[in-house]
Amino acid sequence: MKIFAIQLQPLDDKNARKQIEQLKPFVSFEKRAAAERFRFLIDARRTLLGEVLIRHIIHEMYALPMEQIIFETEGNGKPVVRQIPSFHFNLSHSGDWVVGAVDDAPVGIDIEEIKPIDLAIAERFFSADEYQDLLSQPAERQEAYFFHLWSMKEAFIKLTGKGISYGLSSFTARLSEDGQATLRLPDHEAPCVVQTYSLDPAYQMAVCTRKPAAAEHVEILTCENMLSRLNNV
């Protein structure tokens, strides 16, 4: 497994549009069209960078020309690479970060920006144990803890490829005092490992895999770094 993260730097509208135009040649027509529909430039940047990141990783790992990489969608909506059925990947973005995980087995990744939220949402979407864990945290830690649990749950759901219909309250994410992350799953689910990462103090990130362990290292890139790599392809 490999995990990558790209941090977007603040740009004024002129330079943001310039960066978007620099990224467009490296993505599919469908992704370009999707980026053009976004109201906010940062959403377009994140969307384009996600696909560019995966295409570049595939190019480096398999020497497959970026323009020949074809993405298809499985019945559950999860994207796959037509030419490399054994290649699994997942993307997530929030705020200033775009993150991706790749492996030879299904993988899920999620990143969440810690921001003010009505914690009552946890009573609706969390299991009873998760909700009680959240309420037991000191008031000043509850928002961060909420996003810890949310990122773990999202990473698992993205691993399964079943989407939000899986039922967020049907399984339980736990985070021990020493930072050990675990999932208690329904009986029909195979065991999996979830790991959290301290990528940025303002964010929570988690990766989920059915392998014995997740990657320990996250390779951090910048948009400028990625564009430099692309220009050398």
UniProtKB/Swiss-Prot annotation:
The gene is psf-1. SUPFAM superfamilies: 4'-phosphopantetheinyl transferase (SSF56214). GO terms for molecular function: holo-[acyl-carrier-protein] synthase activity; magnesium ion binding. GO terms for biological process: antibiotic biosynthetic process; fatty acid biosynthetic process; lysine biosynthetic process via aminoadipic acid. The lineage of its organism: Bacteria, Bacillati, Bacillota, Bacilli, Bacillales. Mg(2+) binds at residues 110, 112, 154. This is 4'-phosphopantetheinyl transferase psf-1. Keywords: Antibiotic biosynthesis, Magnesium, Metal-binding, Transferase. InterPro entries: 4-PPantetheinyl_Trfase_dom, 4-PPantetheinyl_Trfase_dom_sf, AASDHPPT_N, P-Pant_transferase_sf, Ppantetheine-prot_Trfase_dom. Probably activates the peptidyl carrier protein (PCP) domains of surfactin synthetase by transferring the 4'-phosphopantetheinyl moiety of coenzyme A (CoA) to a serine residue. Required for the production of the lipopeptide antibiotic, surfactin. Its EC number is 2.7.8.-. It catalyses: apo-[peptidyl-carrier protein] + CoA = holo-[peptidyl-carrier protein] + adenosine 3',5'-bisphosphate + H(+). Its cofactor is Mg(2+). Gene3D superfamilies: 4'-phosphopantetheinyl transferase domain. Belongs to the P-Pant transferase superfamily. Gsp/Sfp/HetI/AcpT family. It comes from Bacillus pumilus. GO terms for cellular component: cytosol. Residues 161-192 are annotated as: Peptidyl carrier protein binding.
